[in-house]
Each structure stands twice: as C-alpha cells, then as structure tokens.
Amino acid sequence: MKDIELVYKGEIHRIPNRWDAMNDRQYIRLVGDFLRMAAGELSAGEVRINWLCDIMGWSKRKFHSEEQIANLVAISEQLTFMFQINYPDNNSVLDGVDEDTYELCRRIDPYRLNIPLARVLRRLDYQYVIDLCFCAQLIPSVQIGERSYPGYRIETSFGTLTCSLTALQYVEAQGLIERGEESLPLLAAILYYPEKDYNSERAHELANDFAKLPLETLTAISFNFQAFNNYLFSKTLFSLLSKFAHKPKQPITTDASDALYDLSKEGLGNAKQIEQMNVLTYLKVLRKKTIDAVKDMKGFGWDKLKISEEVGLPISVIDKIL
C-alpha cells in the first residue's frame, strides 16, 4: 500500500499508510482504539481519524467547518493498511473478480466504491477486521518499574529477514495466540525474555511482572507477534508450512511442539540445542523436511493423490514441489 501524498500551500505532505511508520507510543495508542472499537465505543472510521491526527500531529479540535471535517474524513478513508473488510461466506461474493478489484473491495467501504459491484456489497452484512500482517517490531522494549526488557528483534535490511527468537520461544508464543486476555502476560514474558538462553520456567515466573503492564501494551505485543507470524506464513517461503489441509500421519509432524523434538530424534541436536535454535533456521528445516518427504514419495512411485493423503498437502502444492 502506497503512502498518501497531499499538496497544501505548495508543500508536499506524506501520510504513512503502513504499520512500520509508527513509533511504539503511536502503535499502542492505536491498539487502545482497536480495543475501544471492539467494545463498541468507536467505529472503524473514528479509529482511522484518531490515528491520522496522531501520526500527523494534528488536533481534531481545530477542524471546525464542514469542509475541514469532510477533508479530514476523506483523507482518513485513504488509510487502508489497518483494516480489511470481510464479507459473508469467506468473501464468496468476490469470487471470480480480478485481483485489483478484490483488493479494492477488501479495503474500501462499499459505500465509498464507485463500481457496479458496490451495490451488491452494500446489501451484505460485512465487518471490519484488523489486518495483522506485517514484518516489524513496533515495541522494541518495555519498561516495568526500574527495569527495561528488550524485545525480540526483526530485521529486513539488505533484502534479508532475520529474527532473534529461538525455536522454543516461537513455539510457546504461537501456542498462546488464541488463549485470550489471561495469557497475555505470559506471552509478553516469553517474547521479551531478558536472558541470552531462553528458559520456559523462568519466563513463567516473569509473567507476574509483565502482568503489571497496561492491557493496551500487552495486547499490542500480542498483535505484533500475530502480525509477524501471519507474515511468515503468507509472505515468505515458509508459506508452504501453512498449506496442510489435515494433520498427516507420517513422516511430517505439523504440530509445532512435536516437530521441535522430532528434530532431536533425527540427530539434529539434543533437545536443549533444538530449543535454542533460531526460529528461522527451525522453519527452514521443517520446510526442507516437507519438500524432501514429497520428493521421496514420488521416487517410490506414489501418485499425487496418495502423496496428498499421506502428507496432508493439497495436490496443487505437491505439483509446485515436484
């Protein structure tokens, strides 16, 4: 998504239209508005306007006339990075449209669209959902009392993705994503673990300290990790690991914690060494295991249907591997 450019009094003003343009304060404040939206206190439009004013340093109180307010709303509606629009039946109404139209309909409210399909979309029960898919660490550290806890690092410089999480940190954090509000302090303690070698028991102890953080901060930490997790499995070569249609019998284990210790059984290191393995190395190993297993089965003379049933991958994915 492109940033927004405005020309005002001969000067060009650029408005960021992306997650990674925020500092930690702006991001946590946005998440606070997401929580208010979930509670029915704010609309999606109000969330966008609040963020626009915050990121640009504008005061909403200075927008008085109808024209000023209309301009503010019009600019805010160009901010498409934070929400997607979900239509019933997994967006089935958009089946068959071209990619550009699909993206437009998922980002722009149907009442603001000027295409024939918009009339159909307006009659449907659609919902705004937060689009959590980005590759950035928006909360580099958190302060609890007198102590600062640095978070995991994500780097994308020079066209290469790196992340400081260990395999065990990642697996444990991933397992907490759907656990709800009560698990947020533990999730934060795992992701902001302060010592070089990650230790699960110590992270559980630290969760009591992280419980002192505001709900907005804890939720922001969770959202950031979810976004990175979604990015890994939709925008990188690791997307292959998200294609399993069902849990295979053998030889691939798709459960993250089981797969972690299966690597130890295969001689890639003892359990401790596997736990401390870098998460991206861990995912590369799982991806290679998946590809090798499919190719081995093909070498045994298995047809694609049998491979699909055994491995759990759709035939279309198996075609790409082979």
Segments the model singles out, each with a brief description of its role:
Residues M1-F300, L305, E310-L322:
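An amphipathic, hydrophobic-aromatic interaction surface with interspersed Lys/Arg
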